[in-house]
Amino acid sequence: MKFLFSTINLRRMLKIGILALFVLLNILNLPAGWADNGDYNRITQWFSSGPAFLPENFPPAGTPAWDRRFYSEWVPFWKLDFPLASGMFNSALLLWAPGILINKLLYSGSVLWAPLASLGVRLVLLALLWRLLNGLEHGPRPVLHMLTLALPLVLLFGTRDVAAFYNSFYQEAGTLVFLPLLLLVVGWGCTRPRDAWFYAAYAAAVLLLVTSKTAAFYWAPLALAFVLPLHKVLRQPRIYLPLAVGLVAVPLAAGLMLTHVPNIGPNRAYNALFGGVLQLSEAPQQRLTELGLAQSERCLALDWYNGGADCSRPDWDKISYSAVVRVLLAEPQIVLKQAQFMADRSQNLSLSFGQYAFGDDYPRRADRLNLWSRLKANIFPRGGWLAVSLLLLGAGIAATWKQPGLAGSLARVGLLCLLALVIDGYVEILGDGQRDLLKHLFIPNVLFDLALLAVFNALLARGAAAFGRKTPG
């Protein structure tokens, strides 16, 4: 009896300690956020017309004012004037709304402090962590999996390079919340009847994730296979076929329509063509000639925002994603080169942007708060070894797929993350080329970590069950 009570107390203490650590890391990381690369303006125009204490929102390129506004320094204070001028919607707005309201009521009616706007992001992540801990607490080997699953997740989502997104008005802020939400729902569906409540929760989770950014569209068809197997649809098509179509079509249409950036012109297609496939082509001049762009060879060295737009202006009508496809059909080996290119640059959560406000000496004391990011950069596999590790993760999934309970659930979550990281990487590099590649590979990097933790814990759960190892709890 005494052992039972001590075990229960250990579970509760560990649970409270893990929650407290996540809260502490978030508090300590409040002074950090990622500098704006120009994407802020797409979303912030709903509630802010620009930085609060800088003279202009778009200073001339190359000036000290431009350098301070973009890329090099994080801007924590924004005008709170609600211009409502954005032409797109992002589900992260739902997370920022509570913090913006509290800011207006209790802090300032005219100046928005970005860390306060991030309150909703942090609270929802805390709630998801609490839900995960509750599930582990009432499952087999709770102490083991709290230490090997929940604690590493806190280190991942609390590391400075990830937490900086919470204070930034990037689309990834929403993805970092609604991705774990969807994974929790998928795991939950593996251990309970998939009734109307389950499908309602799944529909909400996938809708929020798909509307977090345009590149997340693939989650709608991908995740469905894990909650509504094909054999079930074929067995009862009158019931499940309309459900399957609705669970794919509605979030897919909403995501593509709401997150589309209006008036962007050939920007992304230019980056995908000149900054993407042509950079890996063995005969770029020949490909340009075939596309009727022979006179645009000099554009290969130019980013869209640094001369590329003017360079290619006479040929905008010829620059499209169909041109990207034509290059890939002419040189299909580019697909493998893209995979190698991404693999060589994997395992890096740090962007090439500034992370601190002007005059802040915080970086001198912040490395200790970036433990997971540094660990990942130094010891996680990249290049050819990344491919080997993906195969090993696949083997781990195969070994635990048919296991009941936690092991089987984690195997499914691991496979979902594994497939998503490959798809997401290609969507990003095909969609926007090599521009801001570290930022675009951020979500695939997080997905690798989630897959690794899921498969590792699935193997632990299977091993503990098979050999009858008794751990505390």
Regions inferred by a protein language model and the residue ranges of each:
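Membrane-proximal stem/loop segments at transmembrane-domain junctions that anchor or position
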Residues: 47-81, 259-360
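Membrane-interface anchor segments at the N-terminal boundary of transmembrane helices
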Residues: 106-124, 342-417
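Membrane-interface transmembrane helices that cradle and orient dolichyl/undecaprenyl
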Residues: 182-201
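Membrane-interface alpha helices of multi-pass inner-membrane proteins
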Residues: 198-214
